[in-house]
Amino acid sequence: MGLAIGWTPGLTALANAQTADGAAATPRIIAAAANPHSVAPARSEPVTDPVADPRAVVTFGKARFTVLAPELIRMEWAADSKFEDHASFVFLNRRLPVPPFEHEVADAGQKLIIKTSALALTYTPGADGRFGPDNLAIEFAVNGKRVDWHPGLVDPENLQGTTRTLDGALGDRTKEPIEPGLVSRSGWAVVDDSTRPLFDSADFRFLHGEKSPWPWVMERPAGERQDWYFFGYGHDYYKALGDYVRVAGRIPLPPRFAFGAWWSRYWAYSDQEIEEIIRGFHENDIPLDVFVIDMDWHPTFSGERGKLDASGHSKGWTGYSWNRLLFPDPDQFLVTLHADGLKTSLNLHPASGIQPWEDRYPEMAKAMGVDPATKQYIPFDITDKRFARNYLDIVHHPLEKQGIDFWWLDWQQEPKTKLPGVTPTWWLNYVHFTDQQREGKRPLLFHRWGGLGNHRYQIGFSGDTVSVWDSLAFQPWFTATAANVGYAYWSHDIGGHAPGAVEPELYTRWVQFGAFSPILRTHTTKNPDSERRIWAYPEPYSSILRSTFQLRYALQPYIYTEARRTYDTGVAFFRPLYYDWPQEDAAYTTKGEYMFGDQMLAAPVTRPVDKATGLATEKVWLPAGEWIEWPTGKHLIGPATVERSFSIEQTPVYLRAGAIVPMQPPMRYTGEKPVDPLIVNVWPLAPGQTSNYEVYEDSGASVEYQRGVFARTPIKATQAGDLLRVEIGPAQGSYPGMLNTRSYQLRLPADWPPVTVTVNGVPVAHAGVTGKGGWSFEGNTLTTVISVARGSVGDRITVEVRRAAGRAARRNELDGFAGAMTRLRGAYDALRQTFPVSDAPDILVDAMQAGDRLGYHPEQAQEEIVRFHKVLSQAQAAAAEIDKDLAQRAKETDTDAQKQHRLDAAARAHRQVNEACQESQSPLASP
């Protein structure tokens, strides 16, 4: 079975592809590549200076205004006229290039006016100067219309941000409110930073070793103060988030392995059971990168259920010592997992502190000034720097040295700490994430959203949702909306958390969504009926699940490139449609769709199929332009809302015309082997169109990506008449472990086969179905596959593909061909269920085999396509006749059960053939 998108560039032929020797190139620092939305400096590590350039500051009485950008102004008022220059939990860096602005004092010194290119601020202090609706106003424009803001103005059009957890959420019914976002259809947002805690230092240049600085929390000075940030970006949401990460810190790039598959389940696994599950992944050809071990890795005292520990929490809820019954030799167990290429994460509930039964208790007690003989527990106090250092150095670091790669901070019960405004969730995220930076690692933390500023410490654990269709339907909107606060990496329990068994169809659709989400992590509660092992599901679901996991891995070069773009721009690659189409009402009201990087629009199926047809029907809104539906190859023209039907193996993903999508060969885990060949998919371009893309690569594990140690490979595709030219490279930049040489596979889906192919001017011959040493044609998806021999990554490769005269203008004849093939195979399978009363008619088999014939003889493509449309019409009539005939026979001979089965099969086949006919009807104008 093909990959579960419905059809996709084939990868199985590359499973044993020869790889380069992986010789490392010498790193050199390079400038960041041009990006229309990039805010990244050309070459630098992250800079934080909370003290603004004095030229950006205007002080007027008890108020101070800092112009951070034309659309972004900080507004402070202090009763004692003492203003704050420390970094806050949200805003770290205020020393930005000073934008042009004017300011004047008017009305005999009673009024301050500040004007930038985007807004005008007026402040008339009055008696005490405290900001209010009567003395402060900002005027700006949204789509040419004047907008006036003043304190206290309610914004009903804020586009929202995210929330701490989806625990217990049933669909969109969340237990905790979703916080406001930084963008709004009203064109403005205000962040009140008045009471947020501060950092005692702005030295976030984390070094490897004990001398590394570690800024710590401090309270705000006493007194009456206001500290606001006004965002007046109109509908330029890209710029709003871009400037936000300039002042609040960038969204970090996770390690590359994080974009692989994660296994997680709340279950008391032994080491043997875990190894058995890993074997199951390998034996069933399912890739895996991360094994998350839930809380039973440590003693949970299940025999003392209901008993509380000294902190008042359930005994065993927190733990830092291995359960030696389940894990007799943790060191060897972790060696085994790492030998399989896996990363390991352990579950923590830190709230209970360090209890006297923990292995590290004696050392921890001494470090905290407690006599271990007293067995007095060590309370959890993460805002105490002494406790935090000991908590990490004594308790966590030894486990990390054993082989634990990152932590899952599952839950933190208390909503507050000893310090006002400091929540345990927010501060734990900071402490654990920056501890990894101090250790010299590229950090990864799995925890919940703690509030604004937590975009710097990801990945997010969304919590325990209910396993129903409504929960799945809510998650695309929820995940995309988090982009509005820079939270780019939510990880959901794929399949839901509770209460128990999940029907195969729902699990399959959830995994399909997961493949096109930031993190693909399956999970469930401690219930024997809750199954997440792919191979335990019946067919066809098991095969579809497998191919969906494989597709996720195939897309890793694309996903990783888009994650780098997230770091550069501050805009999540999984984002709402209104970032790219802010003037379209449908971009705001369409909640089941999102952009998945710059090249793809995803609209995952979140409802069950119709039992009679085997298809799920969805309404999909497509923005302006030409879009290609990946599962079917159908071209659709936007803006439009279209009604589309999808079988269980199809995931609705739409690509821009001319989209360039890099992919990789099959791998058991990330980094199992070099990405060689790099697979380059170029989707059909419009006449005269040029497309560009840059594939981003780095070591995948170090923080040097922040300092210019990476490489980008440019790809350019141009359609000129019937000639397609694709240029790859040369690679720009380098990093440790970078390939010096590489091969490529160029794939051209949904288009006519070539007449001639050249690589760097040298003709390449058609090499039959194998494609070895030349090019081949995959007829069922109309994909030309061109193998490009290994060469230096520093060279430019030019591939020219010429099709028969006039073919580019007749592309509409191919429209939806891949989808028609899928529907015909479905009809064939359905009719075979009616045997021996009936069977698939020859004319249907003839139509279904058109793709195979094209693959064998691409030179006959024109004749075959013309014939296909004629045969398809005949197959439609034949299917209708069989449907009618079986209905009559069922009345005469069958039992009720037999009758219903055959009637359903015939009706399904009839519908599938009708759908095949619809798929092959092009919305593109005929020449």
Predicted features and spans:
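Bacterial N-terminal signal peptides
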Residues: 1-10
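Sec/Tat signal peptide C-region and signal peptidase I cleavage site
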Residues: 11-16
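Mature N-terminal, pre-catalytic/accessory segment of carbohydrate-active enzymes
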Residues: 17, 21-83, 103-123, 128, ...
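N-terminal accessory segment at the very beginning of proteins
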Residues: 18-247, 256, 273, 278-279, ...
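Catalytic-domain carbohydrate-binding cleft regions of carbohydrate-active enzymes
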Residues: 27-44, 49, 121, 133-656, ...
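Solvent-exposed beta-strand/loop surfaces of large extracellular or lumenal domains
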Residues: 87-102, 370, 628-648, 756-786
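A surface-exposed beta-strand-loop module
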Residues: 110-113, 117-120, 770-798, 806
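Accessory, solvent-exposed terminal regions and/or long lumenal/extracellular loops of proteins
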Residues: 655-763, 780-781, 788-904, 911
